Each structure stands twice: as C-alpha cells, then as structure tokens.
Amino acid sequence: MGSHELFHAVQAGYAAGQDLIVSEATAVWATERFDPTLNDFEAFIRRFLERPERSIFVAPSGLVDGYPYSVSLFFRFLDERFGPEIVLELWQQLEQTPDVDDWVASVDGILSANYGTSFTDEYEQFAVWNVYTGRRANPTQAYQEGARYPLVASTDAELPLVLDRPRMFAASARYWRFAPGNRETITADLAPTDDDTEGLQLWLVPSGVNATMAPIKVLDQTEVSTEDVESMMLAVINPLQTGSSLRPTVCVGSPQEVEACKANAQPSDGGMGDDAGMPDGGDMDAGGSPDGGVDPGPPPETGGCTAHSGAPGGSLLWLLLGVMLWNRH
C-alpha cells in the first residue's frame, strides 16, 4: 500500500468521511514528512502557490483540480511552527466531533487550547511565509526547504500603487511586487471606503541583493526603509476564517503619496471594482491568476490518491506511524 493511501487508512480509524481538503492535504503532508525523497509535495503545492487568492477551506465545485492536495503546504507550516503532533491532535479532535464538518474550526480550537494562538493569527503568518519560496527563500524567516518550493504568484506593479477593491476571500492572500525607486521609505494603508475591511492585514517584505529580509507588518502607516532594498513585496491578507469577502482600497508608496491617495479615495459605489486589483500593465509572477474564488481546473499532473507510492523505506516508516497512531488511538 502506498504511503498516501496508508495515511488515509489511519484517518479512517479516527474520523471517516471528512472534508476532502483536510483528508488529502494531511495525507500529502504526511507522505513528505516521512519520505521526503518523494516529489509529490513540491508538485502539489504549486497549485496553492499559483492561486493564493483562493480561500484555503473551499474545495472546487467541479472536478478535483489538485487544490485540496496543495493545502498540504499549510500543514507543513503548522508542522514547522508547532511540530508534527499538531496533525495528530487535529485528527483526534475530528474523531471527537464527527458531525462537525469544519476542520478550520478544529484547527482554531487546537491552536487556542494548546498553543496560545489562533487560526487567524497563524494564517496571517502562513501567508507571510509564502513570500519566502523559490528564489526568495530565507530559512531564517520561514520554511527550511523553501528554496525547493515554487514561487508564490505575485503581480508586478509600479509606485505609487492604488489597489482598487480587489476581492479578498476569507483565509486568502494576494501579493504585489515593485521597486522602491528613489523613495527613502515605503508605506501602505487602507483608504477610507464604505466597505468593511476589518481584519485585513498589510505586510511589506523587502529584498536586497543577497536575501529577502525580515517582513514588516504595516501598522498606522509604518514606514519601511529602502536602504539596500532592490525590490519589495506587498502582502494583502484576509486571515479571517469566516465572513464575506472584503473589498479594500489599498494605497502604497512614499508617506506623501499614500496620504494623497487616501485623500483622493472615494467611497465605493456598490460596483464590483477591479476584482483582480491589478494595476495597468501588471504581470503575474510564477504563473498565477488574478481571478479570485474557486473554479474547477484540470486534474494535477501527478494524479490523485492512487498515484502515490512510497519507496520501501517510506512504507516501513508509514507502517510504524500507523501503529503509533493506532496505539495512541
């Protein structure tokens, strides 16, 4: 039996018939965790990093497009933050609440009870970590193996930048990349509108010649120095686990440019605005799509569950894992 399928068998011993996303995502996470020589994890997470604007807990309504498998990146994040035991704790919690089809609420409860944090706080950190992938990897800031992961999709932009009401679904993020030019500092802020933007978070991540630097959360127009900075990423994050999508107007540039942008902002007219939030001439990096929400796509090239088979060493590790989980069960 392949390692992926063996973990499904272990899942069934705890709580059969769970949400497709949590079932497939934790199975892919486990395959990578116990047999990192396989390439399934890196192949699957590309789908997530190509579409960070999708809500992490909403599965496609049509054919499975690989997105449920790609959410394994979130469980890798939790593993690196809190250790692999958190996945076992999740399945134990799902066993205790078999009639509750809400794995995000279960994760939130575990984080609150056992780790002193929340899904909202951790999703925000997760979205920031995803900047540190591919050539922007920095293990001092995020994933230890981030250099092996695909780049998160981002949009090329020029300053000053006005993002006109991009749709921000619950538990999703969007990214823009720009050069600071001759500005000494860069900041960002939400422009006043009639739209509810409570809970939305803004982060700036500067990059220098040799490394992507520490991320900076923008609070009250925090000014970020551009000294030794070649480029910068803006992460707009909706970390909320429930609620309708948010439609912010975001101003980015020097402090003076941001103040002027906010002064010129008009309350929304109830229209849809620029759903992509993409400036004229913007280009997506890493093959991402600016469209929000969920849509069916082609099946992943690596296939579904039946495509996963581990090396003999991995199968042995999985057998030991299954026995360990079953004994604790």
Language-model segments: what does each one mean?
Residues T97-P279, M284:
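Beta/coil-rich, acidic/histidine-enriched accessory regions frequently appended to metallopeptidases
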Residues L321-H329:
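C-terminal membrane-anchoring or membrane-association module
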Residues E32-V64, L161-R165, S207-Q221:
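Generic detector of solvent-exposed, compositionally biased contiguous segments
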Residues E50-T133:
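Active-site-proximal alpha-helical
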Residues A12, E32, P36, E80, ...:
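Short, well-ordered loop/turn and helix-capping segments at boundaries between secondary-structure elements
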Residues Q266-G322:
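Ser/Thr-rich, Pro/Gly/Ala-heavy low-complexity intrinsically disordered linkers and tails
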Residues M1-E50:
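Zinc-dependent metallopeptidase catalytic helix centered on the HExxH motif
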Residues A27, F75, C305-A307:
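Residue-level detector of buried hydrophobic side-chain packing
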